[in-house]
Structures are given as structure tokens and as C-alpha cells.
Amino acid sequence: RPSNIIILLFFFLYNVYNFKLLQEKVIFVFKKFHWFLGMLLAFLLVWTPQFIYNLHFTDQLLFYSYTNEKFFFNNPQIWDGLFSYRKGWLLYTPMMVVSIIGMVLLFFRKKEFSVAILVFLVLAVYIIFSWWCWWYGGSFGQRSFVDYYGMLAIPFALVIAELAKTKKWIYKLAVGLVFVLIVFNNFMLQKYLKGSIHFADTTKAAYWHSFWHLRPQSGFFELLETPDYAKAKEGTYVIKQKNPEN
């Protein structure tokens, strides 16, 4: 995914948590600029087969295959992307709340990661939910965040490590909560596979209607709401009107 190029920010901002360190990092980049040119050449080398393919079949070096699909950076759907019943990241993957809590702890325990991960995640959230189809089609939860779970494992692990230093009952309670979240996540995934969570049309009513059931119950499908995809491609998010004959 081309938008993942923002990972470069993580490496640039690693161990940068004050202005002095930022100055030092900028100076370092300029001093070692030839290193970064080498990295760029290596990057382009990996992409060379794709460039050749594009030129051969489209006569274009860079071919945009999404045609009329685009980002709407002036209208990011951040709230819905994080919390909505349709495809809220933190609703369907609540385990990541632990990582977000851990990001606060980074500023006190692991400063070298603090700014790098925060800036990266904020920018990633903004870019991901600026895409016209912020729910990203047929999938369980927000699949676009899967690429970032390795990075988010750092603040997650920090939370567990800090809790391990507390009283045993607190640590055991925390581990138990993590276990419950894992079970919940797998339960929700099974619901998705069995059909009681729709891949894109889930509403609050539909979510709770069949919450305790793996398979959709009677009346479930009447509670779904399909986005108007044509309008969404224009940056307007409304519900597609149902045909009264159906």
C-alpha cells in the first residue's frame, strides 16, 4: 500500500522527543544524505519490474488503477472509522485500546518511541479514514490497520510490563482482561464468518440484535444499512435508499 511510505517518519522521529534531538536528527540526515540516496535507489530498484510492467501495458510509468476512487483529505471519517458499528476499529478490535493507553506511558518509560509512534499513528489514522471507502469493503474490522500492529505491539507490551511491576492481583486481573479481549475478538470473528456481522452494512440495531448468536437471527437483514457507494466516491456519506418493493 503506497500510503505506508509514512513509515519513514517513524525512523526519522525515533529517539526524537525534544527540539534539541530534532535538530541533531536533521543535521545527521544532511551529513549522511548519501545513505538515504542509496536507500532511495534500492527502493526504486525493487519497484523497477512494476515500472516496466506499467510502461509495457499502459505506456505510463505510474499507473493509477483506482480510476475514479480517491482520498478526501478535507472530510476524513475519523469518528466513524474508530467507533462506528459499521466498521469501527476500536469497536471490533478493542485490544488496541491497550496500545493507545501504552502510547501515553511511552512518554514516561520509553521516550525514544513516544513521538515516533504517536505522529505515525495520528497521520495513519488521518490518511486511512480520508479514503472514500473508509470502511474498506468486505472485511472484518479495519483491515488497513493490520500493517501497523507490529508497531502498536510496542506500547501494548509496555503496558503489560508495567503492570507486571504492580501487585500480583492487579497483574493477574490485567492478564485476565487481555485474555477476555482475545476471546471476544475471536468470537466476533466467528460471528463475521457466520454472517451475524455484516462486512459493511452493520448498524447499532443489527449489532445488538444478533450479538449473542453466531448466525444472524430473524429480522437481522432488515436492520442493515448499505452506504451509497456512488455518493461516497464524491465524498458524501449517506445511506442508500432501500427499494420499497424488497
Question: Over which residues does each language-model region extend?
Answer:
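Perimembrane helix-loop-helix junctions
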Residues: I6-F43, I100-K110, I154
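Membrane-lumen/periplasm interface segments of specific transmembrane helices
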Residues: F10-F11, F33-V104, I117-I128, V183-G195
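Membrane-interface helix-boundary signature
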Residues: K32, F36, G88, K110-S114, ...
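Hydrophobic, aromatic-rich transmembrane alpha-helices
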Residues: L91-V119, L152-V159, A174-F179
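Membrane-embedded, lumen/periplasm-facing catalytic core of multi-pass transferases
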Residues: S139, L173-N246
